[in-house]
């Protein structure tokens, strides 16, 4: 049986559960796929060229995580779906010798919310994940605000119709979303007292990090604010990515069940 290689680019990457859940699916669905897939973590130096690495490693597909999602958008031969709007790519697939970029973070995040009725969201951070979430939340009709420590990247969110801030707005939000990398450094993304104010009036504190109780989520727990980590989003976006890797042979709900069973 033919062997195909896949992977996930990131820095850091040691924490990623993507290899675990994708390899479970390549094993489960190898008969339907007609090939044996292997998916591995790829620690990418910050100055690396993603496309060169992808081709050099002979990959058929890859996921992209922090801090490369915006750079991945720039190196694709084609961009499809909501990735065109959000300027960030988390899924790369080699299709007819062209490197095609997709974004499954956007829908993956929305599906992980479970259909709850939220009206407003505050996104902390302005990177590739924040862009994907803002696009999807705007599409779903929410009022979206973005808070970032600097003006870097905020022009994108302004064009999208989001309210943008460099200082914490004095408003209440249903969703408070940590899309920064602060949790990977075991830090809060924002002043503790300011966060407390948001959590006390919010409906859900959501951290894109997963696998441990982050300082962000720990604070929400302390205040008895409902909270959620990024595990659900990871599995949904990975299921949607796997569907792309399989050329739509395996629909994402089937993939989701396998991934959920191993993580």
Swiss-Prot record:
EC numbers: 1.1.1.25
Residue sites binding NADP(+) per the record: 125-129, 208, 230
Cross-referenced CDD domains: NAD_bind_Shikimate_DH
Keywords: Amino-acid biosynthesis, Aromatic amino acid biosynthesis, NADP, Oxidoreductase
Annotated metabolic or biological route of this protein: Metabolic intermediate biosynthesis; chorismate biosynthesis; chorismate from D-erythrose 4-phosphate and phosphoenolpyruvate: step 4/7
EC top class named in words: oxidoreductase
Pfam families: Shikimate_dh_N
An annotated GO cellular component: cytosol
Gene3D superfamilies in alphabetical order: Leucine Dehydrogenase, chain A, domain 1, NAD(P)-binding Rossmann-like Domain
Catalytic activity: shikimate + NADP(+) = 3-dehydroshikimate + NADPH + H(+)
GO molecular function, one term: shikimate 3-dehydrogenase (NADP+) activity
Domain of life, source organism: Bacteria
Family: Belongs to the shikimate dehydrogenase family.
Complexes and interactors: Homodimer.
Role noted for this protein: Involved in the biosynthesis of the chorismate, which leads to the biosynthesis of aromatic amino acids. Catalyzes the reversible NADPH linked reduction of 3-dehydroshikimate (DHSA) to yield shikimate (SA).
Protein name: Shikimate dehydrogenase (NADP(+))
Species whose genome carries this gene: Helicobacter pylori (strain G27)
